[in-house]
Structures are given as structure tokens and as C-alpha cells.
């Protein structure tokens, strides 16, 4: 079964597969939710036929693209008229004599970061974390099976336990029988702190640290050290809630759900490609509850730490 989708602006991931769930058969597979290009793609090369998915930010993509074109290579996959960066990465991989050599070529050539999963013809999955460790890969295990993911929150309901976290630049091969290390990890780690502060799902763990625990503890410390006079703490959903709960406990004030998020119509506000639509989604998905707001001195923990769109767009409502 092969399916490639890309647009998740108006509907969620599962709905894209509702009519085809009965086609999901077999015992091995890879997939990804990408905000850059349709994935996975399938490559036929001297290394054999393989499927690949990537999480990448390639700063020098145009430079590598020009060099590959000068070597008479071509790009069959396009994303919004631009080169599909996953295909570009696959072309770097097939320059190696083995998958490991090819992935190391990616590490050398790419300025930025790139983590990936490769599904080979023999049914094994090669997992490679970017050389700086900026994006995570977590290995899970249960009886007779192994899995790799960027979000450990996907494991509990599938009965997987966290087995290990791949280190920066580490490469492993997974089968149903076990995990084989193909490349040792680098010593230097530069993981993205936004995973705990903003992007991560509350039940996920990165490098052994739980997302909700980090948010709650951050809020707790703020509450213990803040001398502001407030009646209650409120969190802008989603990531602001954990911090506000911690603040409330540290400050010794109640937590009030003064703003709720309506998600059936308005999904995540950073998903749309245009800033105008992102701003609209950010504004429309949050609904204030006046009964919990009026006459109170409120302390809000915001959810949007880049542009501050979530709380800023609701300030007028709060004052009214």
C-alpha cells in the first residue's frame, strides 16, 4: 500500500485514510506528516529499491540542487513547483556504496539538519538522526516488534515501551528481532528546545524528559518567584496550559479555563502556508469564556512564543 498526501490545513491526518484503512496490511511500513513536501517517495537505485521519509531543514538546498543537475541528475518529484527535498536527500544517499555511506554523505553535504527513515527491500528499516540531534528519533519495542518515531506519545496506545533515544548522527537498522547500530552517535547535541516549550505533545518525552513535566515545572518556578497580584492563572491552549497549571500551583492561586480552543473547524494555526490564514486560524479557534474572565486579575501563559498571535488577538476581548 502506497499513499502520498500533503495538505493538512482543513482536515486531520486520519481522515485522509478513512476509506483505505482496510488496505493496511503487512508487518512493516514508514510514514510521516510533513509540512514541506509529499512523502514517502520510492527510489530504485544500485542500493536496491527503498522508500524514504525525512524531517529536514536544508539551508543550502539550491546549492546542492545545482551541483546535482550539473552531474546530469534530474528531479522527478516537485513540491509546489520546487525541488522535493526528500528526493534531493535520496540522490545524495545513492552516491554512497552503502546506505550508511550515503547517509554520511547527507551529513557532510547538508547545512542544516536531516533525520530520516528508509524502508529497504529486505523489510528492515534504517533510522538516522540528524548529526546535530536537533530533531529526535525514539525507538520503541514490544514483543516481536520495534518502531521508530519522533513523538513517543504514539507508543502507549500501541503497547510500545521506549527502548532508547538515538544520539546525534546515529544510524540503526531495525527488524522485528532487534536493533543493530550501524553508526555511533556524535558527542555534541544541539536539540531544539522548542520541542518542550511549544511543538511537543504533552505526553511525549525527548532525551528522557517529559514535555508536560518541563512546562509544568517552568510555570511552577515562575509562580514561586513572581510577585504580581493575580486572582487566577489561565493558559492559552495548548502548550500554555501546562505552564499555567504549574504557575497556579507555585503562586497558590486557582487555575481557570478562561479561553478554550475549538479545533473541529480550526486546526493548528502554524499549519497553513500563508501568514494571513495563520492569523485567521489563530484568532478564530480561541473562544473566551466571559463568565470566567469578568472582574478578575488574570495571569495568562501564552501559547505562541514566536509572534504572540494567540493572546495578542484576544486582548480586545479580554478588556471588553
PLM region descriptions:
Residues 165-166, 249, 291-294, 319-320:
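A structural signal for short secondary-structure junctions
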Residues 252-298, 308-312:
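Short, glycine/charge-rich flexible loops or terminal/linker lids adjacent to PRPP-binding catalytic cores
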Residues 1-167, 173-230, 236:
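Conserved short alpha-helical segments that host acidic/polar catalytic motifs at enzyme active sites
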Residues 88-97, 237, 248-267:
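Amphipathic alpha-helical
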Residues 54, 294, 302:
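A cytosolic small-molecule/anion-sensing beta-strand core signal
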Amino acid at each position: 500500500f502506497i499513499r502520498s498526501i500533503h495538505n493538512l490545513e482543513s482536515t486531520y491526518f486520519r481522515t485522509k485514510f478513512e476509506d483505505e484503512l482496510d488496505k493496511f496490511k503487512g508487518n512493516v511500513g514508514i510514514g510521516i506528516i510533513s509540512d514541506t513536501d509529499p512523502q514517502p517517495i520510492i527510489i530504485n537505485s544500485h542500493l536496491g529499491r527503498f522508500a524514504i521519509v525525512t524531517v529536514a531543514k536544508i539551508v543550502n538546498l539550491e546549492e546542492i540542487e545545482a551541483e546535482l543537475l550539473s552531474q546530469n541528475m534530474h528531479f522527478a518529484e516537485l513540491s509546489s513547483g520546487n525541488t522535493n527535498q526528500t528526493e534531493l536527500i535520496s540522490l545524495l544517499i545513492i552516491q554512497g556504496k552503502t546506505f550508511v555511506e550515503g547517509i554520511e554523505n547527507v551529513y557532510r553535504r547538508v547545512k542544516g539538519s536531516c533525520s530520516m527513515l528508509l524502508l529497504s527491500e529486505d523489510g528492515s528499516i534504517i533510522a538516522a538522526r540528524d548529526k546535530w540531534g536537533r530533531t529526535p528519533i525514539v525507538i520503541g519495542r514490544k514483543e516481536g516488534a520495534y518502531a521508530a518515531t519522533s513523538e513517543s506519545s504514539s507508543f502507549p496506545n500501541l503497547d510500545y515501551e521506549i527502548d532508547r533515544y538515538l544520539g546525534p548522527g546515529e544510524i540503526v537498522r531495525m527488524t522485528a528481532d532487534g536493533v543493530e547500530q550501524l553508526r555511533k552517535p556524535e558527542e555534541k547535541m544541539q536539540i531544539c528546545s522548542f520541542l518542550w516549550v511549544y511543538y511537543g505533545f504533552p505526553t511525549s518525552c525527548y532525551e528522557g524528559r517529559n514535555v508536560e513535566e518541563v512546562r509544568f515545572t517552568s510555570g511552577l518556578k515562575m509562580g514561586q518567584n513572581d510577585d504580581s497580584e493575580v486572582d487566577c492563572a489561565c493558559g492559552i491552549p495548548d502548550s500554555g496550559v501546562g505552564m499555567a497549571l504549574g504557575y497556579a500551583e507555585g503562586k497558590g492561586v486557582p487555575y481557570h479555563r478562561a479561553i478554550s480552543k475549538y479545533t473541529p473547524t480550526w486546526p493548528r494555526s502554524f499549519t497553513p502556508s500563508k501568514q494571513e490564514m495563520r492569523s485567521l486560524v489563530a484568532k478564530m479557534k480561541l473562544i473566551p469564556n466571559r463568565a470566567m474572565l469578568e472582574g478578575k486579575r488574570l495571569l495568562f501563559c501564552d501559547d505562541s512564543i514566536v509572534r504572540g498571535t494567540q493572546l495578542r488577538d484576544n486582548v480586545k476581548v479580554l478588556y471588553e
